[in-house]
Amino acid sequence: MTTLLIVAHAPLASALQAVAQHVYPDCRQGVHALDVPASWPPDEVERRLRAQIAAMGGGDVLILVDVFGATPCKAAQAVTAGRPRTRLVAGVNVPMLWRSVCYAECTLDELAERALAGGQGGVLPVAGAPSDSGPTVVGP
């Protein structure tokens, strides 16, 4: 089973972890969070991220970060470089997280692909009031 680690600007990581555990209570051991406060310099983020991954036992880890190019992402890129049992996906959202929790038994590469698909599929324009037939999607 792949362990999930959410790394994001504080308090987003722990908030997303709480959402995952609210909907999937059995995932408590498999979803971890690292909130990055504005006061941490980049080297501190990287140090804490390395320590958290080490404490998770050395298995496969899918890291979900909030924004590509931001400090949490750069730290995760540095930590995952040369570490074959980690994958990194940027742009975490709730659909991505839920998909990751549901498919944590997949291989690491397959899970990263499913996480990306879940995140992308969960972003769509919606118009109008809710209905029993589903959302009204606005599109081309």
What residues fall within each predicted segment?
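N-terminal loops that bind phosphate or other acidic moieties
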Residues: 1-140
